[in-house]
């Protein structure tokens, strides 16, 4: 991937008392909202407009379909957002990008190496539907390819990605979800491609299935269990006999 693309990031409103430029101990906030985070990159006409709350995506504006896409459908039943507002912000960023590029003497953005982690949403049970999550952090600039592989073959069904979400250091993170049914015959990889990586990174995942006990192990376990049981019987018998003897010697003949 070429690394000479320019980037502009606009945060139009920040509904929080937290200073992103200050230290962590400056001001604490219970909730943080990014309302109107606009990203545009050129060439390629790549951009996004999102609203976030406490690090979770509320919605984004699909630039191709020109519509608002809610992270959860229930959000769209509570409030409305016209996609034209996001499209206008993208157009403004696109207009300003050329000016800022010239002022920066066409200096390209520094490419950071992203970090990826793969984990299941719920405890894994073979044959039970689950979701794999690929969490990719420290993304900059926000252009990345995330691909799911099952047994080294690309998977597209059951895949969902969030938009780029903003970190406090102005880098980004992104989550990719894959719905699947765990099987001991399948292995999965999350493939990450980014300008900051010399080669694609594969994060491997496969279900951890306890190895069955061998016949020798089963025999040893049974023998140990039987031995412990026999020892318990012998010790119990000894205590009973001692108790009876102790009770017999403590008896005294009563008056006639």
UniProtKB/Swiss-Prot annotation:
Record topological domains on the Cytoplasmic side: 245-256
Region described as Alpha-2: spans on this chain: 112-205
Pfam families: C1-set (PF07654), MHC_II_alpha (PF00993)
InterPro entries for the chain: Ig-like_dom, Ig-like_dom_sf, Ig-like_fold, Ig/MHC_CS, Ig_C1-set, MHC/Immunoglobulin, MHC_I/II-like_Ag-recog, MHC_II_a/b_N
Ranges annotated as spanning the membrane: 219-244
Region (Connecting peptide): 206-218
Signal peptide: 1-23
Keyword entries, A-Z: Adaptive immunity, Disulfide bond, Glycoprotein, Immunity, Membrane, MHC II, Signal, Transmembrane, Transmembrane helix
Extracellular-side positions: 24-218
Chief location: membrane
GO cellular component, one term: plasma membrane
SMART domains: IGc1 (SM00407), MHC_II_alpha (SM00920)
Region described as Alpha-1: spans on this chain: 24-111
Glycosylation sites: 145
Subcellular location(s) per record: Membrane
Membrane topology, from the record: Single-pass type I membrane protein
Cystine crosslinks: 134-190
Gene Ontology BP term (one): antigen processing and presentation
Ranges of residues in domain Ig-like C1-type: 114-206
MF terms in GO: peptide antigen binding
Family: Belongs to the MHC class II family.
Protein name: H-2 class II histocompatibility antigen, A-D alpha chain
